[in-house]
């Protein structure tokens, strides 16, 4: 009987923890940060924007949720999330960050978003966007790494020597800009979105390597070379005069030369 009571209590605890609660009325709270961080990690459906008119992290949340909001610095990382697992309805979670020129790595998860008019600029820039999250902003780097998964998205201009683009789980990237080397690992019905600028696709590279699989699609411009392996009904559309003899295709995949 005692074991049964304990088991029922545990089930009730999990059921309560999983309930959706009302976020409550919106309130705002400021959190002090040093500004020395180079990495940002955001979870739990926060909408993040960047401003040069604030000097603290400004959070807007429901008054029932605000006591559980965590904004903390750990080493070179700034972390923003909700303590414990909670699902809420009502007031949207928002965060306004002071502009930080040193920011070079952004990790978003749990349907979070990050929007900046200032972009990210560093020798190495890394984005890890997962769980239906999205990033809007430009990137300038020697080497840029973009990892998108779980129906996440990127929208911005990239200027880099090397761009590594890893996409999976129906993610999409709307990319413009010029890179010397483009390395693609695109799978699971993900898409580099068709984006035409001045009569050619807006993402331009000298050399493109990598793979497309699982009904994925990419649109790019190159006057150099494209050496990509395509499978599972994937398609690579390109403009320019790139050599494509190094490409391989299987499973109804193809490489398409588009002329506008």
Region roles according to the model:
Residues 1-17:
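Sec-dependent bacterial lipoprotein signal peptides
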Residues 10, 19-128, 136-145, 155-157, ...:
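Acidic (Asp/Glu) and glycine-rich low-complexity loops/linkers
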Residues 44, 71, 131, 150, ...:
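A residue-level signal for conserved active-site and pocket-lining positions in enzyme catalytic cores
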Residues 156-260:
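Short, surface-exposed interaction patches in beta-rich subdomains
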